[in-house]
Amino acid sequence: MHGPAILVRTLSKADRRDRFGNDWQYHSRSDHHSKVACWGIVFDLLRSSPLLRRHVEAGVVHFGINHEMRDFVHDRKKNLDLVLCTASSAPGRAEKTLVAMAADYGIVLNDTEKAELAKLPALGRAPVGSVLMALEAKACMTAHQRALPRLYDELNSSHLTVHGATDQAIAAGFAMVNIASRYLSPDLNKKNRATDPEWSEHKQPRDAELAVDKIRQLPKRSKTGDTGYDALAIVVIDCVNDGSPVGLVSSPPAPQPGDIYHYASMIDRLAHIYATRFKDLG
């Protein structure tokens, strides 16, 4: 699985510039990290699912970005980071591919990943018809305990909206948790970063453990008709946000191999659900 490594490699570049001229690796007001995470999930899912590759090759499945879904039951709406979908007949944006999206978001691939991407069928962007899978990615980078209620609510509202719109759709969640003991927050370092940086101190690994435990409380489902995510992954990173390389953490509190929240488990589960739920598509 390449997604987590692609994510930390890409986040190691400080190319999110704020209005004060500061360049950041992560900025809470940018959706860059979410799009990179979702790109990696789709990349790994394409590699893992023969049926999805066939559907893409046949031109049956496309992707959409920031797609608005509306919960029919409660009449609430939410923009989802990335969806896999059939194409609508309505006019929309010109088609763009997953490869082009990687260039647009500055996603950093190594030679092996580039070679594997080149072998995959071209997944194109299209106006969204029926949503097959909706991906939502969130991050908990600092002030962990204070951020948890909002993080939980944002992730919880995603699967509710997806399944309120169409119960057959696969709802996938991704959460990135920072385990760095100190952090340079863009919110606290606007004009003073170069001369007098203000560091946020974390009690680690306790703060990261609190976040991971809270995310584990999100509802999950094993069949349509139930409430919850169809698949959910937690990735732990070490990001100081000062320009130093971002690290991928594999030791606890990061989910271990075989854990249902491990990234590879999520990809395997998504591939299995897709194969059973959409075997007759097209």
Model-identified regions with their sequence ranges:
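Short glycine-/polar-rich loops that comprise or flank the Walker A/P-loop
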Residues: 131, 167-171
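Short, conserved beta-strand edge motifs with alternating hydrophobic and charged residues
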Residues: 136, 170-177
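C-terminal tail/extension regions appended to the core domain(s) of diverse proteins
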Residues: 1-64, 168, 179-282
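Substrate-engagement module of ASCE P-loop NTPases
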Residues: 157-165
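Eukaryotic short linear interaction motifs
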Residues: 91-92, 142-144, 180-184
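Conserved catalytic cores of phosphodiester-cleaving nucleases, focusing on short active-site segments
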Residues: 82, 131-139, 155
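Surface-exposed cleft-lining segments at the edges of enzyme active sites
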Residues: 138-150
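Active-site metal-binding core of divalent-cation-utilizing nuclease and nuclease-like domains
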Residues: 57-129
